[in-house]
């Protein structure tokens, strides 16, 4: 049985972990293992392959069960644990690995994020602490097309977070890597591009400024920042060359051809450890081990066989890597390169000696730009049109000048040669200064792409395949029909009588989108925090991905969990109108009795009165949206006192099909008279699962259900979308209906709040 066949079995068996809605229980897994062993011992090849695939699938199930176990068993009360610090900001944010529980050794990879507390003495990576922990399971916001933090946590084996109530040092020694990194940081603090040198050499990107990261994203050069195959392969190649050079002076009987290969491999592993064994670096080492083993086998392997074996080895080593975006990008990029050069090789007329390096580099970048489009658009919702030009000088400069200098500087830092080391660091600093001087002269090349184009991004692949098989002349009708199908989302139009309400999952805040005829307005804009807000992180990307430009915003009130993203939205769409009860400059009024039309929908403000003395929550702008048959009542953070005041004025007009739960489901809102007068059928609530106020109140949830409402909230469902059409409505809950994955479940305590 060929190794490539085993690799295919492993890949096809583990990939379903990405889509499975639930994990089988352990009893089922053991039954499957027995069946897999029985099948793999059969004589017929297809039965043997099936048995191997079942065994690899069970290996993935066991890895997933191992990652889920801590969340369901360690979040029920205080835990006595020993934790090894793996990362820290030196203050209140720490990452660690649990190595023992209640005095017993833990072999599973249990990562934990600790926050909010200072440790009783100076902390550094590598220290071992005895702690009393209060842990909780990972739970992330989930929006259509948004960043999936919960999936990423599983891929990083970081599924627990929490606080420590007691901590005592067990071993205060810092790791060798931590000592080396601290020394290196002190040395590089004198250089302008020191943070970037640390990022390129050690993978420490926290100190790289946001402006630099944005510039690299806009120019398509962000991939150069990761400690990946480029850096580690360069380091391994340098050691391989050094070992070959040493062999030149040795007697022939002492020369073993495998030694340079093994030396390079060992140094690659050492360098990956030095950079913190980040997932991309660890995967590169695994791939290099596979490559070395294949090389020493004495057989000739095709590029596709090598690719399959490397990917399979990575997934067997860590089945949850199938959830990793970085692995998907790396594997897809290598596959695209193989495909590009095999199916569309560089024309021979371009291979003149003088033009060959430039032609090869341009050809490489064109291939990467075209063939990586499907994954770029799917993950990042766009691509950089300036990446072709930027990478033409950035890749050679970083690969052949900056990174070798940084590696040399890191090596010299181990020895007392300060003068020589400073020359190397200065040269590396100047090379990066030159690189970013050039990058800053390029126009902002980032191009947002909405979801309608994601199928058309497959065209470069399909055109190359069609050209090689002469499909355009053999079956032109099929090619034309295929293009029409790929472009279907561009010319398809939804029913004209429908409209949608989207409650975005923004955590402890509120942001709702009203959509009709390809237009949108927002009710509230999410929350803000130091250095960012919901609009930058979530709302603006969501709107652009869904091809929506907001025409206006209804702002319920001024609190930061509702108005936090307003400035960012206004920057993105300056012509957007704002309606609020705040009487701020440029705001249209939103007071009781006002009425307006938008896209055939009627908006009526029911609170506050124009001359109210109320402030904060009780001045929330309450708006009813009506299409003539069904309606929605948006209530902001209105509390019981204001609810009763609103009911005293034309309460019959408040009847609605759906209500947005006031004040995130707090005890101070959602009075019984309001729920009875609204007479609704569905209630939508927005909050974070782990919020400081323990919303929603159990009493409030029970009240809604008693009054006949269907209760839906963002922690349980993620983004909630309701589509209204003639005499009907359709509710889509992202976590349960559209992305029902085992890693999206509610882990830990069944109910956290109340």
What do the predicted segments below correspond to?
Residues 118-132, 158, 351-354, 410-754:
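Non-globular, low-confidence helical/coil segments that flank catalytic cores
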Residues 232-251, 288-295, 334-344, 405-409, ...:
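Membrane-interfacial alpha-helical segments at the cytosolic side of multi-pass membrane proteins
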Residues 1-72, 76-82, 243-255, 259, ...:
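Transmembrane helix-bundle segments that form internal channels/tunnels in multi-pass membrane proteins
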Residues 56-223, 533, 537-541, 545-549, ...:
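Membrane-interface helix/helix-cap signal primarily in integral membrane proteins
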Residues 257-265, 299-315, 348-360:
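Short hydrophobic alpha-helices at membrane interfaces in multi-pass membrane enzymes
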Residues 155-287, 293, 631-636, 640, ...:
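Aromatic-rich juxtamembrane segments at the membrane interface
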Residues 22, 272-281, 296-300, 317-327, ...:
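Membrane-interface helix caps and helix-loop-helix hairpins in membrane proteins
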Residues 266-273, 289-296, 312-320, 373-377, ...:
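Alpha-helical transmembrane segments of multipass membrane proteins
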């Amino acid at each position: 049985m060929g190794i490539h066949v085993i690799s295919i079995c492993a890949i096809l068996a583990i990939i379903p972990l990405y889509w499975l809605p639930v994990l089988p229980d352990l009893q089922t897994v053991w039954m499957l293992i027995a069946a897999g062993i029985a099948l793999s011992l059969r004589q017929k090849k297809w039965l043997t392959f099936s048995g191997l695939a079942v065994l690899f699938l069970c290996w993935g199930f066991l890895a997933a069960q191992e990652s889920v176990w801590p969340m369901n068993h360690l979040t029920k009360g205080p835990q006595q644990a020993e934790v090894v610090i793996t990362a820290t900001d030196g203050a209140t944010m720490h990452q660690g690995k649990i190595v023992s529980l209640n005095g017993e050794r833990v072999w599973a990879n249990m990562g934990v994020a600790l926050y909010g507390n200072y440790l009783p003495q100076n902390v550094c990576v590598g220290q071992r602490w005895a702690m009393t922990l209060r842990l909780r399971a990972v739970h992330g916001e989930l929006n259509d097309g948004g960043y999936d933090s919960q999936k990423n946590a599983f891929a990083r084996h970081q599924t627990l977070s929490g606080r420590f109530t007691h901590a005592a040092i067990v071993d205060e020694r810092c790791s060798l890597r931590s000592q080396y990194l601290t020394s290196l940081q002190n040395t590089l603090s004198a250089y302008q591009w020191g943070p970037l040198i640390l990022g390129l050499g050690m993978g420490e990107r926290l100190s790289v400024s946001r402006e630099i990261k944005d510039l690299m994203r806009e120019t398509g050069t962000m991939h150069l920042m990761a400690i990946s195959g480029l850096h580690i392969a360069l380091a391994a190649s340098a050691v391989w060359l050094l070992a070959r050079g040493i062999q030149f002076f040795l007697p022939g009987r002492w020369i073993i051809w495998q030694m340079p290969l093994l030396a390079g491999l060992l140094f690659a592993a050492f360098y990956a450890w030095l950079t913190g064994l980040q997932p991309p670096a660890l995967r590169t080492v695994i791939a290099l081990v596979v490559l070395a083993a294949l090389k020493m086998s004495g057989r000739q392997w095709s590029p596709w066989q090598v690719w399959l074996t490397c990917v399979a080895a990575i997934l067997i080593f860590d089945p949850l890597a199938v959830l990793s975006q970085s692995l998907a990008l790396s594997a897809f990029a290598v596959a695209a390169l193989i495909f590009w050069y095999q199916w569309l090789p560089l024309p021979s007329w371009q291979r003149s000696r003088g033009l060959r390096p430039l032609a090869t580099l341009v050809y490489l970048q064109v291939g990467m730009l075209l063939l990586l489009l499907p994954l770029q658009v799917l993950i990042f919702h766009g691509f950089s049109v300036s990446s072709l030009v930027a990478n033409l000088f950035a890749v050679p400069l970083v690969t052949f000048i900056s990174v070798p200098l940084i590696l040399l500087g890191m090596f010299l830092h181990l020895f007392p040669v300060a003068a020589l080391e400073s020359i190397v660091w200065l040269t590396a600093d100047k090379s990066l200064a030159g690189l970013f001087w050039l990058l800053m002269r390029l126009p902002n090349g980032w191009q947002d792409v909405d979801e309608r184009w994601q199928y058309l991004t497959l065209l470069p692949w399909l055109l190359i395949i069609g050209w090689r098989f002469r499909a355009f002349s053999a079956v032109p009708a099929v090619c034309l029909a295929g293009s029409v199908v790929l472009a279907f989302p561009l010319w398809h139009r939804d029913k004209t009588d429908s409209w949608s309400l989207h409650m975005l999952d923004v955590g402890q805040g509120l942001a709702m989108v009203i959509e009709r005829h390809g237009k949108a307005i927002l009710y509230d804009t999410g929350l803000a925090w130091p250095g960012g807000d919901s609009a930058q992180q979530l709302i603006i990307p969501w709107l652009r991905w869904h091809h929506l430009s907001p025409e206006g915003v209804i702002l319920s009130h001024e609190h930061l969990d509702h108005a936090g993203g307003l400035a960012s939205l206004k920057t993105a769409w300056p012509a957007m109108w704002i309606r609020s009860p705040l009487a701020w400059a440029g705001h249209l009024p939103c007071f009781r009795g006002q009425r307006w039309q938008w896209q055939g929908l009627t908006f009526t403000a029911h609170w506050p009165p124009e001359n109210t003395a109320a402030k904060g929550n009780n001045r929330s702008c309450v708006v009813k949206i009506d299409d003539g048959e069904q309606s929605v009542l948006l209530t902001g953070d209105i509390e019981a006192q204001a609810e009763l005041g609103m009911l005293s004025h034309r309460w019959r007009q408040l009847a609605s099909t759906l209500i947005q739960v006031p004040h995130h489901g707090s005890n101070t809102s959602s009075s019984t008279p309001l729920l009875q007068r609204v007479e609704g059928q569905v209630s939508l609530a927005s909050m974070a699962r782990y919020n400081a106020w323990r919303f929603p109140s159990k009493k409030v949830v029970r009240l809604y259900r008693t009054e006949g409402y269907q209760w839906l909230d963002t922690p349980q469902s993620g983004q909630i979308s309701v589509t209204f059409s003639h005499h009907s409505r359709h509710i889509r809950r992202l976590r349960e209906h559209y992305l029902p994955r085992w890693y999206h479940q509610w882990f830990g305590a069944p109910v956290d709040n109340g």
